[in-house]
Protein backbone atom coordinates (compact mmCIF):
# COMPACT_ATOMS: atom_id res chain seq x y z
CA UNK A 1 0.00 0.00 0.00
CA UNK A 2 2.88 2.37 0.78
CA UNK A 3 4.17 1.78 -2.79
CA UNK A 4 0.88 3.17 -4.17
CA UNK A 5 1.25 6.32 -2.07
CA UNK A 6 4.92 6.73 -3.05
CA UNK A 7 4.04 6.34 -6.72
CA UNK A 8 1.29 8.97 -6.50
CA UNK A 9 3.62 11.42 -4.77
CA UNK A 10 6.34 10.84 -7.40
CA UNK A 11 3.85 11.45 -10.21
CA UNK A 12 1.91 14.36 -8.75
CA UNK A 13 3.83 15.72 -5.77
CA UNK A 14 2.11 17.60 -2.96
CA UNK A 15 1.44 20.76 -4.98
CA UNK A 16 -1.21 20.54 -7.70
CA UNK A 17 -0.15 21.43 -11.23
CA UNK A 18 -3.78 22.21 -12.03
CA UNK A 19 -5.38 23.85 -8.99
CA UNK A 20 -4.37 26.90 -7.01
CA UNK A 21 -7.45 26.73 -4.73
CA UNK A 22 -10.17 24.25 -5.70
CA UNK A 23 -12.35 25.28 -2.73
CA UNK A 24 -13.61 28.32 -4.64
CA UNK A 25 -15.43 25.94 -7.02
CA UNK A 26 -17.45 24.30 -4.23
CA UNK A 27 -21.05 25.46 -3.62
CA UNK A 28 -20.32 26.43 0.02
CA UNK A 29 -17.74 29.04 -1.03
CA UNK A 30 -18.91 32.66 -0.69
CA UNK A 31 -16.98 34.99 -3.05
CA UNK A 32 -16.29 38.67 -2.39
CA UNK A 33 -18.63 39.64 -5.23
CA UNK A 34 -21.65 37.88 -6.75
CA UNK A 35 -21.99 38.83 -10.43
CA UNK A 36 -25.54 39.24 -11.79
CA UNK A 37 -27.17 39.11 -8.36
CA UNK A 38 -26.67 42.76 -7.38
CA UNK A 39 -30.42 43.53 -7.45
CA UNK A 40 -31.26 40.53 -5.26
CA UNK A 41 -28.50 41.43 -2.78
CA UNK A 42 -29.73 45.02 -2.56
CA UNK A 43 -33.37 44.07 -2.10
CA UNK A 44 -32.71 41.46 0.58
CA UNK A 45 -30.30 43.74 2.45
CA UNK A 46 -32.86 46.56 2.43
CA UNK A 47 -35.52 44.31 3.98
CA UNK A 48 -33.17 43.07 6.69
CA UNK A 49 -31.85 46.56 7.48
CA UNK A 50 -35.40 47.69 8.24
CA UNK A 51 -35.57 44.97 10.89
CA UNK A 52 -32.09 45.82 12.20
CA UNK A 53 -33.21 49.43 12.64
CA UNK A 54 -35.91 48.33 15.07
CA UNK A 55 -38.92 48.21 12.73
CA UNK A 56 -41.35 45.28 12.67
CA UNK A 57 -39.55 42.42 10.90
CA UNK A 58 -40.95 41.02 7.66
CA UNK A 59 -40.26 37.37 6.88
CA UNK A 60 -38.86 36.56 3.45
CA UNK A 61 -39.56 33.64 1.12
CA UNK A 62 -37.06 33.09 -1.70
CA UNK A 63 -37.90 30.98 -4.75
CA UNK A 64 -35.70 29.78 -7.58
CA UNK A 65 -34.44 26.71 -9.38
CA UNK A 66 -31.31 24.87 -8.23
CA UNK A 67 -28.13 26.83 -8.92
CA UNK A 68 -29.72 30.28 -9.23
CA UNK A 69 -27.74 31.75 -6.34
CA UNK A 70 -30.42 31.74 -3.62
CA UNK A 71 -28.33 30.25 -0.82
CA UNK A 72 -25.08 32.05 -1.62
CA UNK A 73 -26.85 35.44 -1.82
CA UNK A 74 -28.57 34.91 1.54
CA UNK A 75 -25.33 33.78 3.20
CA UNK A 76 -23.47 36.71 1.63
CA UNK A 77 -26.00 39.29 2.85
CA UNK A 78 -26.45 37.99 6.39
CA UNK A 79 -22.70 37.49 6.95
CA UNK A 80 -21.96 41.05 5.73
CA UNK A 81 -24.71 42.46 7.96
CA UNK A 82 -23.39 40.53 10.95
CA UNK A 83 -19.86 41.80 10.26
CA UNK A 84 -21.05 45.42 9.97
CA UNK A 85 -23.28 45.16 13.04
CA UNK A 86 -20.37 43.81 15.08
CA UNK A 87 -18.17 46.77 14.10
CA UNK A 88 -20.94 49.14 15.30
CA UNK A 89 -21.55 47.18 18.54
CA UNK A 90 -25.02 46.20 17.33
CA UNK A 91 -26.40 42.76 18.14
CA UNK A 92 -27.21 40.83 14.99
CA UNK A 93 -26.63 37.15 14.33
CA UNK A 94 -28.02 34.42 12.12
CA UNK A 95 -28.69 30.69 12.03
CA UNK A 96 -28.34 28.87 8.71
CA UNK A 97 -30.12 25.50 8.70
CA UNK A 98 -30.29 23.17 5.72
CA UNK A 99 -33.49 21.39 6.70
CA UNK A 100 -32.82 18.57 4.25
CA UNK A 101 -29.68 17.61 6.16
CA UNK A 102 -31.00 18.33 9.66
CA UNK A 103 -34.00 16.13 9.09
CA UNK A 104 -36.00 16.35 12.34
CA UNK A 105 -37.75 19.19 14.14
CA UNK A 106 -35.55 18.62 17.19
CA UNK A 107 -32.34 18.96 15.17
CA UNK A 108 -33.63 22.11 13.45
CA UNK A 109 -34.64 23.95 16.64
CA UNK A 110 -31.47 22.73 18.40
CA UNK A 111 -29.32 24.16 15.59
CA UNK A 112 -31.17 27.49 15.79
CA UNK A 113 -30.67 27.63 19.57
CA UNK A 114 -26.99 26.70 19.29
CA UNK A 115 -26.38 29.57 16.86
CA UNK A 116 -26.78 32.07 19.73
CA UNK A 117 -24.49 30.08 22.02
CA UNK A 118 -27.08 27.92 23.78
CA UNK A 119 -25.92 24.43 24.76
CA UNK A 120 -28.50 21.89 23.66
CA UNK A 121 -28.02 18.11 24.00
CA UNK A 122 -28.35 15.99 20.86
CA UNK A 123 -31.35 14.22 22.41
CA UNK A 124 -33.26 14.11 25.66
CA UNK A 125 -35.27 17.33 25.74
CA UNK A 126 -38.78 17.98 24.50
CA UNK A 127 -38.97 20.19 21.42
CA UNK A 128 -41.12 22.65 23.37
CA UNK A 129 -38.41 22.88 26.06
CA UNK A 130 -35.66 23.63 23.50
CA UNK A 131 -37.90 26.29 21.94
CA UNK A 132 -38.63 27.87 25.34
CA UNK A 133 -34.93 28.01 26.22
CA UNK A 134 -34.16 29.57 22.85
CA UNK A 135 -36.82 32.29 23.23
CA UNK A 136 -35.69 33.12 26.79
CA UNK A 137 -32.02 33.25 25.80
CA UNK A 138 -32.80 35.36 22.73
CA UNK A 139 -34.75 37.93 24.74
CA UNK A 140 -31.89 38.15 27.25
CA UNK A 141 -29.46 38.64 24.35
CA UNK A 142 -31.66 41.37 22.92
CA UNK A 143 -30.62 41.56 19.27
CA UNK A 144 -31.93 40.65 15.81
CA UNK A 145 -31.74 36.95 14.99
CA UNK A 146 -32.09 35.99 11.33
CA UNK A 147 -33.15 32.36 10.83
CA UNK A 148 -32.45 30.90 7.39
CA UNK A 149 -34.30 27.66 6.58
CA UNK A 150 -32.87 26.27 3.36
CA UNK A 151 -34.87 23.68 1.35
CA UNK A 152 -37.74 24.46 3.71
CA UNK A 153 -40.24 22.66 1.44
CA UNK A 154 -38.58 19.31 2.23
CA UNK A 155 -38.87 20.01 5.94
CA UNK A 156 -42.57 20.89 5.77
CA UNK A 157 -43.41 17.81 3.69
CA UNK A 158 -41.64 15.63 6.23
CA UNK A 159 -42.33 17.30 9.58
CA UNK A 160 -45.27 19.66 9.02
CA UNK A 161 -45.30 23.40 9.72
CA UNK A 162 -45.83 23.56 13.51
CA UNK A 163 -42.31 24.82 14.24
CA UNK A 164 -42.52 27.38 11.45
CA UNK A 165 -45.80 28.62 12.91
CA UNK A 166 -44.08 29.11 16.27
CA UNK A 167 -41.15 30.94 14.69
CA UNK A 168 -43.26 33.34 12.61
CA UNK A 169 -45.26 34.18 15.77
CA UNK A 170 -42.22 34.31 18.06
CA UNK A 171 -41.90 38.11 17.97
CA UNK A 172 -45.12 38.29 20.01
CA UNK A 173 -43.25 36.53 22.84
CA UNK A 174 -40.16 38.75 22.62
CA UNK A 175 -39.78 42.18 24.21
CA UNK A 176 -36.06 42.92 23.67
CA UNK A 177 -35.18 40.82 20.63
CA UNK A 178 -36.56 40.18 17.16
CA UNK A 179 -36.63 37.25 14.74
CA UNK A 180 -36.67 37.37 10.95
CA UNK A 181 -37.35 34.14 9.09
CA UNK A 182 -35.94 33.53 5.60
CA UNK A 183 -37.22 30.46 3.76
CA UNK A 184 -35.45 29.16 0.65
CA UNK A 185 -37.23 26.77 -1.71
CA UNK A 186 -37.22 25.40 -5.27
CA UNK A 187 -40.98 24.80 -5.10
CA UNK A 188 -43.05 27.74 -6.37
CA UNK A 189 -46.19 26.11 -4.92
CA UNK A 190 -44.64 25.70 -1.47
CA UNK A 191 -46.88 28.20 0.36
CA UNK A 192 -50.01 26.49 -0.94
CA UNK A 193 -49.21 23.53 1.33
CA UNK A 194 -48.88 25.68 4.46
CA UNK A 195 -51.47 26.26 7.13
CA UNK A 196 -53.24 29.58 6.26
CA UNK A 197 -51.99 31.03 9.57
CA UNK A 198 -48.39 30.32 8.53
CA UNK A 199 -48.88 31.29 4.89
CA UNK A 200 -49.75 34.93 5.57
CA UNK A 201 -46.71 35.47 7.82
CA UNK A 202 -44.11 33.30 6.08
CA UNK A 203 -44.36 34.95 2.67
CA UNK A 204 -44.72 38.61 3.66
CA UNK A 205 -41.94 39.40 1.19
CA UNK A 206 -41.34 37.11 -1.78
CA UNK A 207 -38.29 37.09 -4.04
CA UNK A 208 -37.82 35.03 -7.20
CA UNK A 209 -34.31 34.31 -8.49
CA UNK A 210 -34.28 33.87 -12.29
CA UNK A 211 -31.99 31.32 -13.96
CA UNK A 212 -28.61 32.51 -15.25
CA UNK A 213 -28.05 32.64 -19.01
CA UNK A 214 -24.90 31.36 -20.73
CA UNK A 215 -23.26 34.79 -20.76
CA UNK A 216 -23.84 35.29 -17.03
CA UNK A 217 -22.56 31.79 -16.26
CA UNK A 218 -19.43 32.56 -18.28
CA UNK A 219 -18.77 35.63 -16.09
CA UNK A 220 -19.25 33.60 -12.90
CA UNK A 221 -17.00 30.75 -14.08
CA UNK A 222 -14.29 33.13 -15.31
CA UNK A 223 -14.23 34.87 -11.93
CA UNK A 224 -13.92 31.58 -10.04
CA UNK A 225 -11.47 30.01 -12.52
CA UNK A 226 -8.99 32.85 -11.99
CA UNK A 227 -8.94 32.00 -8.28
CA UNK A 228 -9.19 28.21 -8.60
CA UNK A 229 -6.65 27.28 -11.28
CA UNK A 230 -2.98 27.86 -11.92
CA UNK A 231 -2.31 30.35 -14.68
CA UNK A 232 -2.59 29.00 -18.20
CA UNK A 233 -4.00 25.54 -17.40
CA UNK A 234 -7.51 26.19 -18.76
CA UNK A 235 -7.70 25.64 -22.51
CA UNK A 236 -9.55 28.24 -24.58
CA UNK A 237 -13.20 27.32 -24.92
CA UNK A 238 -13.49 25.27 -21.71
CA UNK A 239 -15.29 27.96 -19.72
CA UNK A 240 -17.64 28.74 -22.64
CA UNK A 241 -18.38 25.03 -23.05
CA UNK A 242 -19.18 24.54 -19.34
CA UNK A 243 -21.38 27.67 -19.40
CA UNK A 244 -23.31 26.47 -22.44
CA UNK A 245 -23.92 23.01 -20.94
CA UNK A 246 -25.19 24.49 -17.66
CA UNK A 247 -27.33 27.08 -19.45
CA UNK A 248 -29.16 24.22 -21.20
CA UNK A 249 -30.06 22.88 -17.74
CA UNK A 250 -32.06 25.92 -16.55
CA UNK A 251 -28.99 28.13 -15.99
CA UNK A 252 -27.61 26.15 -13.06
CA UNK A 253 -24.44 27.85 -11.74
CA UNK A 254 -23.82 24.99 -9.31
CA UNK A 255 -23.80 22.56 -12.23
CA UNK A 256 -21.38 24.83 -14.14
CA UNK A 257 -18.99 25.05 -11.17
CA UNK A 258 -19.15 21.28 -10.62
CA UNK A 259 -18.33 20.68 -14.28
CA UNK A 260 -15.30 22.95 -14.12
CA UNK A 261 -14.06 21.48 -10.83
CA UNK A 262 -14.50 17.83 -11.86
CA UNK A 263 -12.87 18.55 -15.25
CA UNK A 264 -9.83 19.84 -13.39
CA UNK A 265 -9.80 16.87 -11.02
CA UNK A 266 -9.89 14.38 -13.91
CA UNK A 267 -7.07 16.24 -15.69
CA UNK A 268 -5.10 16.14 -12.43
CA UNK A 269 -5.71 12.40 -11.95
CA UNK A 270 -4.54 11.69 -15.48
CA UNK A 271 -1.38 13.78 -15.06
CA UNK A 272 -2.37 16.31 -17.71
CA UNK A 273 -0.84 19.77 -17.99
CA UNK A 274 -4.06 21.50 -19.10
CA UNK A 275 -7.83 21.21 -18.69
CA UNK A 276 -9.37 20.62 -22.12
CA UNK A 277 -12.90 20.22 -23.48
CA UNK A 278 -12.31 16.45 -23.56
CA UNK A 279 -12.00 16.52 -19.76
CA UNK A 280 -15.27 18.46 -19.54
CA UNK A 281 -16.95 15.68 -21.54
CA UNK A 282 -15.51 13.09 -19.15
CA UNK A 283 -16.67 15.20 -16.19
CA UNK A 284 -20.21 15.31 -17.60
CA UNK A 285 -20.38 11.50 -17.54
CA UNK A 286 -18.81 11.25 -14.08
CA UNK A 287 -21.21 13.80 -12.57
CA UNK A 288 -24.20 12.08 -14.18
CA UNK A 289 -23.15 8.74 -12.70
CA UNK A 290 -22.74 10.36 -9.28
CA UNK A 291 -26.20 11.95 -9.53
CA UNK A 292 -27.79 8.62 -10.43
CA UNK A 293 -25.98 6.82 -7.60
CA UNK A 294 -27.02 9.39 -4.97
CA UNK A 295 -30.61 9.41 -6.24
CA UNK A 296 -30.82 5.63 -5.78
CA UNK A 297 -29.06 5.25 -2.41
CA UNK A 298 -31.29 7.92 -0.83
CA UNK A 299 -34.56 6.28 -1.96
CA UNK A 300 -36.89 4.92 0.75
CA UNK A 301 -36.91 1.12 1.18
CA UNK A 302 -40.02 0.31 -0.90
CA UNK A 303 -38.76 2.44 -3.81
CA UNK A 304 -35.43 0.60 -3.66
CA UNK A 305 -37.18 -2.78 -3.67
CA UNK A 306 -39.35 -1.82 -6.65
CA UNK A 307 -36.34 -0.48 -8.56
CA UNK A 308 -34.33 -3.63 -7.80
CA UNK A 309 -37.12 -5.80 -9.19
CA UNK A 310 -37.32 -3.60 -12.30
CA UNK A 311 -33.55 -4.01 -12.80
CA UNK A 312 -33.80 -7.81 -12.54
CA UNK A 313 -36.76 -8.01 -14.94
CA UNK A 314 -35.22 -5.60 -17.48
CA UNK A 315 -31.91 -7.49 -17.43
CA UNK A 316 -33.79 -10.69 -18.23
CA UNK A 317 -35.81 -9.37 -21.19
CA UNK A 318 -35.05 -5.65 -21.86
CA UNK A 319 -38.46 -4.37 -20.69
CA UNK A 320 -41.15 -5.16 -18.15
CA UNK A 321 -44.63 -4.03 -17.10
CA UNK A 322 -46.27 -2.64 -13.97
CA UNK A 323 -48.04 -5.97 -13.40
CA UNK A 324 -44.81 -7.98 -13.58
CA UNK A 325 -43.05 -5.55 -11.27
CA UNK A 326 -45.90 -5.71 -8.76
CA UNK A 327 -45.90 -9.52 -8.77
CA UNK A 328 -42.13 -9.68 -8.21
CA UNK A 329 -42.27 -6.99 -5.50
CA UNK A 330 -45.20 -8.67 -3.69
CA UNK A 331 -43.40 -12.03 -3.68
CA UNK A 332 -40.27 -10.60 -2.07
CA UNK A 333 -42.31 -8.67 0.52
CA UNK A 334 -44.16 -11.85 1.53
CA UNK A 335 -40.85 -13.73 1.73
CA UNK A 336 -39.61 -11.00 4.08
CA UNK A 337 -42.85 -11.34 6.11
CA UNK A 338 -43.97 -7.78 5.26
CA UNK A 339 -47.30 -6.58 3.92
CA UNK A 340 -46.81 -5.34 0.33
CA UNK A 341 -48.04 -1.92 -0.75
CA UNK A 342 -51.07 -1.76 -3.04
CA UNK A 343 -50.83 -1.99 -6.84
CA UNK A 344 -51.92 1.65 -7.05
CA UNK A 345 -49.10 2.74 -4.72
CA UNK A 346 -46.53 0.72 -6.69
CA UNK A 347 -47.79 2.38 -9.87
CA UNK A 348 -47.22 5.77 -8.20
CA UNK A 349 -43.68 4.72 -7.20
CA UNK A 350 -42.96 3.69 -10.81
CA UNK A 351 -44.14 7.15 -11.95
CA UNK A 352 -41.84 8.78 -9.38
CA UNK A 353 -38.86 6.72 -10.56
CA UNK A 354 -39.68 7.78 -14.12
CA UNK A 355 -39.82 11.46 -13.12
CA UNK A 356 -36.42 11.10 -11.42
CA UNK A 357 -34.97 9.79 -14.67
CA UNK A 358 -34.02 6.40 -13.20
CA UNK A 359 -36.33 4.45 -15.51
CA UNK A 360 -38.17 5.07 -18.78
CA UNK A 361 -41.86 4.21 -18.82
CA UNK A 362 -44.47 4.49 -21.55
CA UNK A 363 -48.19 3.79 -21.37
CA UNK A 364 -49.32 1.71 -24.37
CA UNK A 365 -52.67 0.37 -25.54
CA UNK A 366 -52.53 -3.39 -26.21
CA UNK A 367 -55.99 -3.63 -27.70
CA UNK A 368 -58.05 -6.39 -26.08
CA UNK A 369 -55.32 -6.80 -23.42
CA UNK A 370 -55.96 -3.24 -22.27
CA UNK A 371 -53.62 -0.39 -21.34
CA UNK A 372 -50.30 -1.16 -19.68
CA UNK A 373 -47.06 0.60 -18.83
CA UNK A 374 -43.85 -0.60 -20.52
CA UNK A 375 -40.78 -0.02 -18.34
CA UNK A 376 -37.14 0.13 -19.46
CA UNK A 377 -33.78 1.32 -18.11
CA UNK A 378 -31.04 2.93 -20.17
CA UNK A 379 -28.22 0.42 -20.64
CA UNK A 380 -25.53 2.91 -19.61
CA UNK A 381 -27.37 3.53 -16.31
CA UNK A 382 -27.83 -0.12 -15.33
CA UNK A 383 -24.34 -0.68 -13.81
CA UNK A 384 -24.60 2.48 -11.66
CA UNK A 385 -28.12 1.63 -10.43
CA UNK A 386 -27.10 -1.97 -9.66
CA UNK A 387 -24.09 -0.74 -7.69
CA UNK A 388 -26.27 1.64 -5.67
CA UNK A 389 -28.70 -1.22 -4.88
CA UNK A 390 -26.08 -3.86 -4.06
CA UNK A 391 -26.83 -3.78 -0.30
CA UNK A 392 -30.61 -4.08 -0.75
CA UNK A 393 -31.75 -7.60 0.11
CA UNK A 394 -34.50 -8.65 -2.26
From Swiss-Prot:
Task: Recall the GO molecular function terms of this protein's record.
Answer: ATP binding; ATP hydrolysis activity
Q: Which SUPFAM superfamilies match?
A: P-loop containing nucleoside triphosphate hydrolases, Winged helix' DNA-binding domain
Key word Nucleotide-binding present: yes
Q: Which GO terms describe its biological process?
A: DNA replication
Q: Is the keyword Transferase assigned to this protein?
A: no
Its keywords, alphabetically, are: ATP-binding, DNA replication, Nucleotide-binding
Binding locations of ATP: 68-72, 212, 224
Q: Give the intrachain disulfide bonds.
A: none
Would you say which domain of life the source belongs to?
Archaea
- Family assignment from sequence similarity: Belongs to the CDC6/cdc18 family.
Function of the molecule: Involved in regulation of DNA replication.
Q: What is the name of this protein?
A: ORC1-type DNA replication protein
Native organism = Desulfurococcus amylolyticus (strain DSM 18924 / JCM 16383 / VKM B-2413 / 1221n) (Desulfurococcus kamchatkensis)
Amino acid sequence: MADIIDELIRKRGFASRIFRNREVLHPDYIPDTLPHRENEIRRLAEHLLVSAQGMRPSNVLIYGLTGTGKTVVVKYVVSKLKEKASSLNKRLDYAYVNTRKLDTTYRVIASIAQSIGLRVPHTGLAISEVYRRYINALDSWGGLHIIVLDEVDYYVKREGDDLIYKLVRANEELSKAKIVLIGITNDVNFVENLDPRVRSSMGEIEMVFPPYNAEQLFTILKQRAELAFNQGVIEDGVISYCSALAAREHGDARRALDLLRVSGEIAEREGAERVTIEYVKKATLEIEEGRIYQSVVTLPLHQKLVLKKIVELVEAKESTTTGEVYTAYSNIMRNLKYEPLSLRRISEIISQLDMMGLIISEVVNRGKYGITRIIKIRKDMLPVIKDALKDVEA
